[in-house]
Regions:
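Bacterial N-terminal signal peptides that target proteins for export
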Residues: 2-18
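Eukaryotic scaffold repeat domains enriched in small/polar residues
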Residues: 26-359
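Hydrophobic core
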Residues: 18-24
Length: 359
């Protein structure tokens, strides 16, 4: 269900206050008109897989409609049927060598093979469609993973000098791409700010969502590393916090201690048919079409009981969104683009041009 966010969010009044503060502060940022619109509450239609809760890391669906869920720590991926009933584990009987120690992310290819980024062993574990461990390759500090055709895998790590590294099925590094955004002079902090998550679509485009960049940003690459589009949310609803984050990071320039960072983008999902992109910033949800045009409003997501939903993974089904939230669990939400009479969905903002790649 959709409800104007009047009680839980001040909406227009808040936007007007922020706009006034921006003007008084002398900001010169151009404020898009959509930033002054009223946010819409998006209420979950119910919970799936009630045994999934704290530690959930990612969710995927196969061609037969089965759902695969990764939790950490946990030795196996949980497999559920279309009705949300658990019926299988991958691997079926995990051992010290075949089990998952601390999986941060996973993906599936078109053949049903599964790839797990296991931070606990600094490896990528590959399971065949029957759930057997096929092979394991060493990758230091894997953070996120996406399966590509021909057995290739795209990986983000916390040690690479690029955003994305492509490996072949045997663990050979094929290519690196994706330049960092320069935010601070401290190399360690700048590397952490550029950490992110990877996702692919059926057309084999690769999406990189910056987890900690002050401005919510997603880049879209083709599988060779050519940058197609960059989506950067620089509206009045996100700009004040982005400015505050940049000031906080700048204040740490002369500090040698580790700098804790708060997540900005916590999840993204891509519609496998349309290529539309859904981006979650805390409990807020925004929508772009495949060409990077902003669609509709900003949505605030809640459980039926009124608790905020902050996803760590988003699955886009034909008629609904599925949120995997740590620790809340897995919830279904209506797709606002399927309810145009209630929550208008229209193209709005054009994407920023993709940044040039360094030779």
């Amino acid at each position: 269900m959709f409800f104007p966010a009047i009680v839980r969010r001040l909406g227009i009044l808040c936007a007007i206050s922020l706009l006034a503060a921006a003007i008084l502060a002398g900001w010169t940022t151009v404020i898009p008109a959509r930033a002054q619109e009223l946010d819409i509450e998006l209420e979950s239609t119910g919970r799936l897989m009630p045994d999934v809760g704290p530690g959930v890391r990612a969710i995927h669906r196969d061609s037969k409609g089965r759902y695969y869920v990764l939790t950490a720590p946990g030795p196996s991926i949980l497999v559920y049927d279309r009705d949300g009933q658990l019926y299988r584990h991958i691997p079926k009987e995990p051992s010290k060598t075949t089990g998952i120690v601390y999986g941060l992310d996973f993906d599936m290819d078109s053949e049903g093979d599964i790839y797990v980024a296991d931070r606990g062993t600094d490896t990528i574990k590959m399971y065949d469609s029957d759930g057997r461990l096929a092979r394991s390759i060493d990758v230091p500090a894997p953070n996120s993973i996406a399966a590509l055709p021909g057995g290739e895998i795209a990986v983000s790590t916390t040690t690479s000098r690029h955003l994305i590294t492509i490996y072949d099925a045997n663990g050979n590094r094929l290519r690196d791409f994706g330049d960092f955004v320069h935010v601070t002079q401290r190399p360690d902090v700048n590397r952490n700010v550029n950490a992110g998550r990877i996702l692919t679509d059926p057309s084999n485009f690769i999406y990189y969502a910056f987890s900690y960049l002050p401005e919510p940003t997603v880049r879209k690459y083709d599988r060779t590393g050519h940058a197609e589009t960059e989506l950067s949310l620089q509206t009045i609803e996100f700009e004040p916090e982005a400015q505050a984050r940049r000031r906080y990071i700048a204040d740490q320039e002369d500090n040698s201690k580790p700098v804790p960072l708060r997540e900005v983008i916590n999840a993204i999902g891509v519609d496998p048919k349309s290529g539309d992109i859904w981006i979650a910033i805390d409990d807020e949800l925004v929508h772009y079409d495949r060409d990077g045009n902003r669609k509709g409003l900003t949505y605030r997501t809640f459980t039926p009981e009124g608790e905020r939903l902050v996803p760590i993974s988003i699955l886009v089904d034909p008629d609904r969104l599925i949120y995997a939230c740590d620790p809340a669990g897995v919830y279904t939400l209506p797709r606002p683009d399927m309810r145009p009479g209630v929550a208008p969905e229209k193209p709005e903002e054009k994407p920023a041009p993709a940044p040039p790649q360094k030779p």
